[in-house]
Curated annotation (Swiss-Prot):
Pfam family name, one: DUF167
Protein's recorded name: UPF0235 protein Adeh_1087
Cross-referenced Gene3D superfamilies: YggU-like (3.30.1200.10)
Superkingdom, taxonomy of origin: Bacteria
Organism the protein comes from: Anaeromyxobacter dehalogenans (strain 2CP-C)
SUPFAM superfamilies the record matches: YggU-like
InterPro entries associated with the record: DUF167 (IPR003746), YggU-like_sf (IPR036591)
GO CC aspect terms: cytoplasm
PANTHER family: UPF0235 PROTEIN C15ORF40 (PTHR13420:SF7)
Segments passing through the bilayer: none
Similarity-based family: Belongs to the UPF0235 family.
Length: 95
């Protein structure tokens, strides 16, 4: 998938977030990125923390293995997940 690639022993994911959704879930590909709805509001980093928590649980990795590379203040984010391949991430997150 276009939104996941392997880079240096980790998966790099291109994500589009929708904060303040009714629940947190991955909803599919949108504009070349994985769209994830987050129940958390985009206030004081709550949406970023919710994204990290969601990805860690969904991918079966520690929260410390999920790093936000770009997009801390925007809806388009680039996330690096250590200890997993892009193929495994796609299998776990594809709706």
């Amino acid at each position: 998938m276009a939104w996941a690639r392997d880079e240096g022993g980790a998966a790099v994911l291109e994500i589009l977030v929708q904060p303040r959704a009714s629940r947190t879930r991955a909803v599919g590909e949108h504009d070349g990125r994985l769209k994830i709805q987050l129940a958390a509001p985009p206030v004081d980093g709550a949406a970023n923390a919710a994204l990290v928590e969601f990805l860690a649980v969904a991918l079966g990795v520690r929260r410390a293995d999920v790093a936000l590379l770009r997009g801390e203040a925007g809806r388009r984010k680039t996330v690096r997940v250590a200890g997993i391949t892009a193929a495994a991430a796609v299998a776990a997150l594809a709706p």
